[in-house]
Structure formats: structure tokens, C-alpha cells
Amino acid sequence: MPNILVTGGAGFIGSHTCVALLNAGYDIIIADNFSNSKPEALNRIKTITGKDFRFYEVDLLDLEKLEKIFEENSVDAVIHFAGYKAVGESVAQPVKYYHNNITGTLMLIKAMAKYGCKKIVFSSSATVYGPVNPIPYVEDMPTSATNPYGYTKLMIEQILKDVFVSDNDWSISLLRYFNPIGAHPSGLIGEDPNGIPNNLLPYICQVAVGKLERLGVFGDDYDTPDGTGVRDYIHVCDLADGHLCAVKYVLEHKGVEAVNLGTGKGSSVFDVLHSFEKACGKQLPYKVLPRRPGDLPAYYAKTDKAKELFGWEAKYDLDQMTADSWNFISKNPNGL
């Protein structure tokens, strides 16, 4: 079976994708520097799958260490998750984000090219659709960004497109995903960010386990069914399967394709909160706060291309996502 290098493989989406790859019979190599993940995730991946893999603790900015991976292993394709991902922090520390995300990716591309590995699945984001496109978002819409994090995703997409133009032997999949939540049904891995969470679900989880007094709901006066922001939430296991399909695709096709991974349906903050209340069996206090600048009222994906190209579509509904999130957090109240 092909050998897949997964950068950021100990992180939330990375760890679930590693489980999917191992269960599908792939050999994997994980590279991570634990900047936003924990070593325990690697043990949990082994426990879930009963399989072993090679691991390198490496920062992508360290070209020498990075090249060592390619020197010591025959790598057939790369799934590139590694990167900083907090929107607010990117606004406060843009240079840190541009340096880490873009330079790290350039180093990776350099190493790949040097060792003749020209197949990559890149972890992009729905943020590249910017603030003005109508919904649902379709892959051929114009792209833009509103913060440094979004710009790093957009720039990396452009870099990879340019790499393909310069060398048509490359196979590149740009996966634009929406709002991943949920956790592996075993409850062994899930979202466990280092530091302040960036997403809605970890905050709801913290309220549910008593670490946070109440949930802050940013704005209830949007033009949406219940006034709160609407997003396309996708189960992380569906997302992991999407990466599996993308890897199969790049192993067999040359070219560059941007593909949405979402459910194609929007859920509001209150939808998610009430679904989670069902899962944990209690009411969770919340407080409506002013809107956050830059937040969009609603967005969700058009997912036809993923079905067409990969034969992939999301399977899990919101109640399953929140049930699996609760299962993970109740088994791991203090994280991994």
C-alpha cells in the first residue's frame, strides 16, 4: 500500500485522518511539532487502529530535519495539515502566521520536489471564499480573505497552483473545509486544542463539564432563522474520509483541484447548543453578546464536486456530531 506522510498528524483533523488511513491499509508517517496538539494523540491512534507508524517530531521550518523524513522513507503522497489556525491570533501576530504557515509549506514543497514526491492534499479552508460571495459557496467562485490566517490559506493555494503550472507532473488537491466538530466514536481522540479554543464546540464542551460558567453567543440579530450565526458543521470522521478519498484521487490523477468538504447544510449556534444539550442531558447557560466584527451571518458549502470527483459525501448529522463530541469530552474532561 502507498506510504502517506501526514504533517500535523497529531492534531484534531490530522489524528482522525491518520486513523482512517491506517484502517484503510495505508502506511503512514506522522510529522508534528506539538504546537497545537499532544503526544498522547499518537498513542490513541495506535490504540484505536492496533497499527504502528513512524513518527518524526519536526518543525516544517527545519528543512534539514524535514528532508531526513524523505531520505529515510519512500513517500508516495503528503497530506499537509500543519499550520497555525487561530483567526484572532493571526490578526494580532500576522508575521508569526505568514512565516510559519507559508514558509513551512514552501519548505515542504522544496523537500517533496527534491525527493520526487509530487502528490499533495492541502488542508485549506472555507475562509478563502471571503466575505462577499453568495451562499452556498461553490469552488469556482472568486476567492479573497479577511484576516492573515485566511490569507495564508489563499496564498498557499496559489503557490500550489503555480507549482503545477511550472511542472504538470504534480497532483494537488486543495480541500476547503467548513466547520469540523464531533470526535471519533471510541471517545479516544477529539478536539483538544492547546490554549484558547477557536471554535464554538470546545466552548460548549467547557460549559458542559463546568469549566466555563456560560457560553457567549456573539449576536442574535443576524438575518438567519433564529438570529444566530449559521455555519456548515461537518463531522470530523466525515472529513477524515474526505481526505482518504482525496489521497486516492491524487495518487491516480495529475492536476490541481479545489474541493469543498461540508454537509451542504447550515446549522445555527442555537441549533448546535440545543443538540449538545440533548447529548449531555442538561440545559447549558448562555449569554448573548455583541456581534464579533467580521463574522458573517451564514455560510455553507455546495458539495456536488466532492461527490462527482471523489464519490464522497457527508454521512453524519448534527446530533451524531454533538453526541460524539460529548462522548469524547465526558471521557476526557481534562483533554488528552
Residue ranges and their predicted role:
Residues 1-183:
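N-terminal Rossmann-like NAD(P)+-binding domain of SDR-like oxidoreductases, especially those catalyzing
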Residues 58, 70, 97, 192-196, ...:
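Pocket-edge positions in alpha/beta enzyme catalytic cores
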Residues 98, 146-154, 190, 194-198, ...:
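Short-chain dehydrogenase/reductase
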Residues 182-184, 221-222:
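Short, basic/glycine-rich phosphate-binding loops at helix/coil junctions
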Residues 186-188:
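Catalytic core of nucleotidyl cyclases, primarily class III adenylyl/guanylyl cyclases
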Residues 201-336:
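C-terminal substrate-binding subdomain of Rossmann-fold SDR/epimerase-dehydratase oxidoreductases
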